[in-house]
Structures are given as C-alpha cells and as structure tokens.
Amino acid sequence: MEEFGISPGQLVAVFWDKSSPEEALKKLVARLQELTGSEGQVFMENVTQLLQSSHKESSFDVILSGVVPGSTSLHSAEVLAEMARILRPGGCLFLKEPVETAEVNNDKMKTASKLCSALTLSGLVEIKELQREALSPEEVQSVQEHLGYHSDSLRSVRVTGKKPNFEVGSSSQLKLPNKKSSSVKPVVDPAAAKLWTLSANDMEDDSVDLIDSDELLDPEDLKRPDPASLKAPSCGEGKKRKACKNCTCGLAEELEREQSKAQSSQPKSACGNCYLGDAFRCANCPYLGMPAFKPGEQVLLSNSNLQDA
C-alpha cells in the first residue's frame, strides 16, 4: 500500500469489475480505510457504471482501478477521461491492466505504450510504468473467461499518472516583465538625415528636375468619353436585345423604359369585361376573337386587331 502514497483524510476511489475476486476486494478496501482514517473516505464502484454515475468534478485525491489482486480490468479512452475529470488537481491515478507484448493487430488489448498514450490523452501527466510481470494462472483464466482473449504474450502492467495542478479550461494571468521606456533618443546619422532633407534652396536649383503632373496627360486623356463607347461589345448583340445580369452600360434601363412605354400605349378596357370572352365584349372591343384571359394578364394586340378596332 505504500506505493499508492495514501495519507489520512484523503478521498480514495476504488474501481473494480466482474473479474475482481470478492475477498481480495474486501481486504483491499479494509486496508485503505485504515490508511485514510476517520476523516477520509473510501468509495467503491463497478468501473462499468462510472460513465453513468455523474460524479462531481475533482472529487477524489487518489483513484485505484484494476489493482485488486487477480483483477484483469480493461480501461477504454472514455473511462480514462472520466477518471481524469473526477480526480482533483495534483491527484494520482493508479491502475493495472493486462497488455500485449507481441506485435499483433487487435482492438481489444493495448500495448504498454498505447496504455501510457491513452493516459496522456486523457489529460494526465508524469505517466510512469511502475511494474510489469507475468500473469498468474488465475489471471490467465480470468482473461480467457471474461475477455475471451487467448495469448501467451500477455503481461500485467501497473502504471500511474498525475493530474496537473489546474483544471482543464482554467485561466491564469501571465506575469510579463515590464518594459521600461528609454528616455534616451536614438542617435541619428547626419549623413543619412541629409539624404532625406530637401531645402528651399535645393528647389530653386537648376540641377533639380521636377515633373509637372499636367504634362503626364495628353489632350486625348482629358476628353470625355462617348457613352456609346462604354458599352460592352457583347451587350445587346443579336436580333433580340438583352441586357447582361449586372448591366452597367445603361441598356437595362433603356429596355425597361421601352417596355413601360409599350405597355402604356396598349389600349385599356373601358367596360372591364374584356377578359371574360367575346360574349361580354363590346362591338368595337379590340379583343374580339381572342380567348378569355385572366384579369391583369398582359395581352399583346397585333396591328390588324388595332386597325379593326
């Protein structure tokens, strides 16, 4: 028990599973209760119920899992992450698990290195392998019965990890050194400053060539362009004039004006019954002979209809 570093007043959690011998579990818990004393507490739970228990964050000082003699517990990534969550900052986790030493492809058994990597990914630090030994005959039988795994290259590994002295997501103010502003002005090279200085006397010097901005433009550049020349070459080409989607040459507005002008020139019904059909139309109705249409529907009349009307 000394390797667990348990002291009086601590809260210790012991996780077991169906492979843990009952008598060995009772003996372990009794010894832990002696170490924690009356001010401490030893909590026991089946590891398969850990994810459903909803323990409070940072609840235990020490967590022991799979350390019951004869136990062959396996720990998933979710279980390890939950153990790290309920462990207090600075608390320690001790677990024992059978691992595979041969190079085999399986998802059931982890190697010792993969087990340490899983502990690191769960948020623990200072991961150490404390012990590696061969499985006892009882543990080999337990692996075959409870895990359904057969291998001669299994070893029992005991590892430990520590939770950092801060919670995940916590923030801390950084103490940055105060940079004192210097009152001493930087030294300026006189030769360099002279290169960037242009006095009034230099402006009157005949050797200084100044460019007149007006001379940069030709007379052709100052002429206003013809609006027709600004239209895109392909805009409105063909028999049917059609403006581009993002027309900027004015063709869209021109077509809209032509359309509104054509609509205003169309004759309007005086009686309001033209859309019902010939039975309801006047003798001089321009829509005679045309089928009925919906109210408000646009109907274009040919020149012959207009002349007959």
Curated annotation (Swiss-Prot):
Keywords for the protein's UniProt record, in alphabetical order: 2Fe-2S, 4Fe-4S, Apoptosis, Cytoplasm, Iron, Iron-sulfur, Metal-binding, Mitochondrion, Nucleus, Phosphoprotein
Renumbered residue ranges of the record's region Fe-S binding site A: 235-249
Region (Fe-S binding site B): 271-285
Top-level taxon in the UniProt lineage: Eukaryota
Compartment annotation: Cytoplasm; Nucleus; Mitochondrion intermembrane space
Family: Belongs to the anamorsin family.
Protein name per the record: Anamorsin
Species whose genome carries this gene: Mus musculus
